[in-house]
């Protein structure tokens, strides 16, 4: 959906859904306000006073944006990503920023590829940070060895958020 379409829908009042009488949690202003929320298709286009053909009365229930877990090791939960999602989404977390360092220690790049594949179709939005090297220190012994250059294959994936520059140890090679 294009931004111009959303702007037009908001301007013309083309709401596909209006959630009435909600206590809207504004995480930017640290306020809770009683308001209606206008939705066009699957995007919120306004908060204020709205009406529409398809209305839901929230009855004062709280309406908050999805929470973002800024750093998580999904594999440390000892469950697959879909099971992890079933536990966290009912509590409001809709996005996680995962560091697949644990699985990279064991399975290398194949483990990171597996994490991408296992999270491709989930309703949970999973973004990835990339470890700069595996193992984390030269004193560790794990199932795999990766340096920053090995991470290049993941750098341009749409869900890759962060790439750490090579460590001084890697630059000397």
Model-assigned labels for residue ranges:
Residues 1-18, 23-66:
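Histidine-rich, glycine-flanked metal-binding segment
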Residues 61-83:
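Di-metal (Zn2+ and/or Mg2+/Mn2+) metal-binding site signature of metallo-dependent hydrolases
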């Amino acid at each position: 959906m294009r931004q111009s379409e959303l702007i037009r829908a908001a301007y013309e009042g083309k709401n596909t859904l209006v959630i009435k009488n909600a206590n809207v949690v504004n995480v930017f202003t640290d306020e809770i306000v009683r308001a209606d929320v206008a939705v066009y298709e699957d995007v919120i286009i306004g908060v204020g006073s709205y009406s529409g053909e398809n209305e839901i009365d929230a009855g004062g229930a709280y309406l908050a944006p999805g929470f973002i877990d800024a750093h998580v090791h999904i594999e440390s939960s000892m469950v697959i990503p879909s099971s992890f999602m079933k536990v966290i989404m009912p509590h409001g977390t809709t996005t996680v920023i995962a560091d697949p360092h644990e699985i990279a220690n064991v399975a290398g790049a194949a483990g990171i590829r597996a994490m991408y594949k296992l999270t491709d179709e989930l309703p949970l939005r999973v973004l990835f940070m990339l470890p700069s090297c595996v193992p984390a220190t030269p004193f560790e012994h794990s199932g795999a060895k990766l340096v920053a250059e090995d991470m290049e294959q993941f750098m341009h994936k749409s869900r890759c958020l962060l790439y750490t520059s090579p460590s001084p140890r890697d630059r000397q090679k």
